[in-house]
Design a protein with these regions (language model features):
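Active-site-proximal, substrate-binding regions of enzyme catalytic domains
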Residues: 2-250, 260-301
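Conserved residues at the C-terminal ends of beta-strands
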Residues: 257
C-alpha cells in the first residue's frame, strides 16, 4: 500500500467539509492507498487547548473528535521525527533493528488515551511542559539555522550564490555541510555520545537512501539554509512546517493546501509526489480524482 500524508490544512478541510472517514478510506483502499497521520498534525490540533481562547479550544475539540473516526479505523500514525531519527541511527549502527515508521499498537493506544484526556479537559503538567518545550524547539531551530550560517561565512556565500537549479543538485549530494547539520540533530538525541562517533553515524545515514527521515531532515535543513542565505531570513513558522515534511518522509504522496509546503516537500523528500488543493476545493473528490488521473501531481527531486 502507498501512503498519503496530509498536513494539518488538509485535515481541517476534510473536517469542515464533513468528509466521511469510512467512505474516503475505503475509496482510497480500492486504489491501494491509505492515509498516514502525522504526529505533528495531532500536535497542532492539540495545542489549540493551550491558547486560553475558548473559541480556539472548541475548534481543537472539533478537529480531534473528527480525527478519532480515523483512529477507530486504525489509520497508522507516523512516529515523531526524533523517534525516527533515533531508530534509524540505532539501525545503521547495528544496535537495534528499525521495525516500522509507524507507532505500534501500544503507542497507538497511548495517543488515543491522551486525546481522550484533552477532550475531557484533563491536562497534566507534563503535557503543558511538552507543548511549551515544542514551541521553544521551533524557535531554537530557526535561530540555530541562522547562527550556523553566520558561523560559516563560506557556506553562506556558496548557498547564497546558488540558483534554485543549483540547490537541487546540491541536495542530491552527500556533502560535509549536510552531515554537520544532521550531526546537530544527533547530538540532541544522543548527548552522551562523542561528536566524533556521531559524525560517523551521520555519514552512514546519509549514504543510504534507506534512512529516509535522516535524509529528509538534512535536505530540509539545507533547503531552509539556502532560503535563509538568499533572503536574509525565513518566516517564523517555516521550521515548524518542515516537521510535517520530515514526518512524510516514509510516505508516497504529500497533500496540502499550501504551495510553499509542497515546495519544501519536493526539495526535502526524495521521490515523493505532492498534491496542492485550493482552500475551497472538495478535498475528498479532489484526492480521488487526482490520484485516479495522475493530475496535479509533482514528483520530488
Amino acid at each position: 500500500m502507498r501512503y498519503l500524508y496530509g498536513d494539518t490544512s488538509i485535515w481541517n478541510r476534510l473536517c469542515d467539509q464533513d468528509a466521511d472517514p469510512n467512505e474516503l478510506c475505503s475509496a482510497l483502499a480500492l486504489r491501494d492507498l491509505g492515509f498516514a497521520i502525522g504526529y505533528n498534525v495531532l500536535y497542532e490540533m492539540a495545542k489549540s487547548f493551550f491558547t486560553g481562547t475558548e473559541q480556539v479550544t472548541e475548534r481543537g475539540r472539533k478537529l480531534l473528535n473528527y480525527m478519532k473516526h480515523y483512529l477507530s479505523l486504525h489509520v497508522p500514525i507516523v512516529k515523531e521525527n526524533w523517534a525516527l531519527l533515533v531508530e534509524e541511527a540505532l539501525d545503521v549502527t547495528g544496535t537495534a533493528k528499525m521495525e516500522s515508521c509507524f507507532r505500534n499498537s501500544s503507542q497507538y493506544e497511548d495517543v488515543i488515551k491522551e486525546i481522550d484526556k484533552l477532550l475531557r479537559g484533563e491536562i497534566a503538567r507534563e503535557v503543558v511542559e511538552f507543548f511549551a518545550g515544542r514551541k521553544s524547539l521551533v524557535r531554537t531551530s530557526r535561530d540555530a539555522l541562522k547562527d550556523q550560517l553566520d558561523a560559516r561565512p563560506g557556506v553562506k556565500t556558496i548557498l547564497g550564490s546558488a540558483s534554485e537549479e543549483a540547490i537541487a543538485d546540491l541536495l542530491r549530494t552527500d556533502i560535509i555541510v549536510g552531515r554537520t547539520m544532521l550531526l546537530g540533530h544527533l547530538r540532541r538525541e544522543f548527548p552522551k555520545n562523542s561528536p566524533e562517533s556521531l559524525a560517523v553515524v551521520a555519514k552512514l545515514l546519509l549514504q543510504s537512501p534507506k534512512y529516509r527521515a535522516s535524509r529528509a531532515m538534512t535536505r530540509a535543513d539545507l533547503y531552509l539554509a539556502w532560503r535563509c542565505a538568499t533572503r536574509g531570513s525565513i518566516r517564523a513558522d517555516l521550521p515548524d512546517d518542515t516537521f510535517h515534511v520530515v514526518s512524510a518522509s516514509y510516505c508516497d504522496v504529500f497533500v496540502t493546501t499550501e504551495a510553499d509546503q509542497a515546495d519544501i516537500a519536493l526539495h526535502a523528500v526524495e521521490g515523493i509526489e505532492t498534491l496542492v488543493f485550493n482552500q475551497d476545493e472538495n478535498i475528498s473528490d479532489g484526492l480521488l480524482n487526482s490520484i485516479q488521473t495522475g493530475s496535479a501531481v509533482q514528483s520530488g527531486l
